[in-house]
Amino acid sequence: MSSIYLDHNATTALDPRVLESMLPWMQRQSGNPTSRHVFGRSARDAVEHARTQVAEACGAYASQVIFTASGTEANNFAVKGIAGNQAGSQILYSAIEHPCVSRPARAMQQAGWLSDAIGVDAHGVLSTAQLQQQLQKPTSVASVMLANNETGVIQNIAEIAEIVRKAGAFMHTDAVQGLGKVPVSFTDLNVHAMTVSSHKIHGPQGAAALILDKRVDIQPLLHGGGQERGLRSGTENVAAIVGFGAACELAVANVAQFASHTQMLRDTFELGLKALDVTIFSQQSTRLPNTSFFALDGIEGETLVTALDRKGYAVASGSACSSDSTEPSHVLLAMGIKPDLARGAVRVSFGAHNTLLQVTDFLTTLKNEILRLKQLTGVAA
């Protein structure tokens, strides 16, 4: 039995065209991009071409792109690096951020910084009123994600950034889930720093970027050879960076088609969900077109995910980076969802290659598994 992949917010398959762009850098002698000989110059040219591709995909300048090994590294870099020059000030982050933003913010407390979470409403939308109140204290950086990896809710980052700028703080957004699904522009979002990642857009794992306004004074996390303008030391992963650039080019070219196709699949899926007595989260909000997050009262999300996996469908119970946790989704708790219902949450995230037939077949399987689990657990059908 072949499995159907419905977990594209976790990671995506490598596009064959991306792999083709990477192969020369994996199969033949590649120089160190800092070396001055012909092999090094060739590698440097490849990295700089990819830098331009990433910049163009993100509405930025190539000089603003700093390559990292992951979105987690880029987010840590933004939070710790920007705050690092302003000891004693506070770091703000939304209550629904990925742990690679919230945890470094909280970790900075041990070194003398303050950190605080900005609340969201019942639909997962950030409270700008609370943000304005919190900004009355001296603030170094505020980090609010463009699109949530669980609910898919899209924040009005340009509006939030304007509020943050007026308070004299720096604004960072984690745009990892947005790139390739919706138009993303560093300039239009009006932020000082933005994170994007390769493996969410059919590029290779091991490549990401922090896009940074060059006027921002940031402290490097890694010290060594001084690569990436002295801001991120370490020999560049040429093959992965080349793949990232190619993936960016393809993602931007296909973003409208992706959005139209996956929203059709998502809307069809959620129409079918209504007959299954489930709670669909954030339906009232502007969301990523491919994402549906729902829950069943009385059935653990992990239990349903495992049951569906056995039937050939790969879905998630929340963020892939914390899917081994038995705790309810911190995103749903921040939205005021009761813990018992939050524990029943399941995320489905569609991709460009999923089909309508797969959706209808999945709905049938989902209905059967829900009925079976309700009978086993004694939950009223």
Task: Annotate each predicted stretch with a short phrase.
Residues 1-381:
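Pyridoxal 5′-phosphate
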